[in-house]
Amino acid sequence: MVETGTLNELINAVMKLDKKPQIGFIPLGTMNDFARTIRLSTKKTFLAKNIDEGNIIPSDIGTFNNSYFNYVAAFGAFTPVSYVTSHKLKRKFGKLAYFIVAIKYLNKIRPYKITIEAEGESVTDEFIFGSISNSKSVGGFEWFKRSGVKINDGEFEMLFIKRPHGIIGYTKTIFAILFRKHNNKKYFEYYQTDKIKIKSESGIPWTIDGEFGGRKKEVEISNINMAIEYIIPM
């Protein structure tokens, strides 16, 4: 059984091998995000009995400067929101539950002035959140439509949320997030591509596969297509 950080350590070890073994794992904690994406059962007894047999699914892996990540590299606001939003609140209010909890974090949000270089473009702006992922959900929240995410297409989903201004700006941004209006450049920069470079005036604290990834002023991220294979018990 592995948590996110443990699988990240395993991925970093496996990527150094010339002959890479197929990987089977039993998800714990935040790894349910990636497990849902690859349709891996969360029934621990079933997985333990069948961990070495099943369908084989190739998966992309990301490089983060000189290390690797499995499904997400992220920074900024809202990263704790999905974890602290109770199931009771979500059952009662649906997506609005995230909005209710997110409001509590507004006074803790810090913008970062960064330059994004991707797809031959360079964009400099203030952003409160950034995520480079290979998963339908990050932090328990589905940021992207299910049909738009494939774990072995050679591309990552890259979402950056621009700094809102005032309570009205934050409200509109949160609703744009909830209803996945990612192509609206008033609120977001959104890419589906295989590489990106991010530069900041000050070091940004990154989260890599759910674990602290250090403070970085410059980050280069790229996609290694179908780098490893997962075993999915059926």
What positions do the PLM features span?
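Glycine-rich beta-strand-to-loop/alpha-helix junction loops that act as flexible
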Residues: 1-4, 28
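Short beta->alpha junction loops/turns
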Residues: 3-4, 40, 74, 163
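Short glycine/serine/threonine-rich phosphate/pyrophosphate-binding segments
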Residues: 6-10
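Catalytic core of DAGKc-family lipid kinases
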Residues: 12-132
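Gly/Ser/Thr-rich active-site loops/lids in small-molecule metabolic enzymes
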Residues: 89-96, 142, 146-165
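A generic structural signal for short beta-strands and their flanking turns/coil linkers
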Residues: 110-112, 126-128, 152-157, 194
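ATP/nucleoside-binding phosphotransfer catalytic cores, i.e., glycine-rich phosphate-binding loops
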Residues: 118-119, 124, 150, 160-234
